[in-house]
Amino acid sequence: MDKGISKKIKIYIDSVAKNQQWLISAYLFGSYARNQQRAESDIDVALVIDGLNDNDRFEVQVSLMLLASKIDNRIEPHPISKDDLNSSNPFAVEIRRTGIEIKLK
């Protein structure tokens, strides 16, 4: 993966962690994690959030997207609860299967 992209992902995750105490972990997944990205690919980042529930999901998503847009418009945040990440949901399975954990500060 391009070092510039790696740096942008790290800046984004550090910004989220700094502003949101509820971030448990983060994973790069999708085409960038599989090293199959194209010029038009987005940068999928799963953000595991403590206590995320369906009532808050939209508001959290918007907040994460606004922060991502300040760093790189290709960053596509995907908030997910710890319980959902450990479920058999195909989305969660994809994150666990191909995801690369991004270290938090």
Name each model feature, range by range:
Residues 1-25, 34-39, 50-105:
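Catalytic core of pol beta-like nucleotidyltransferases
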Residues 29-31:
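Glycine-rich beta-strand-to-loop/alpha-helix junction loops that act as flexible
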Residues 44-47:
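Short beta-strand->loop micro-motif that forms the acidic, two-metal-ion catalytic signature
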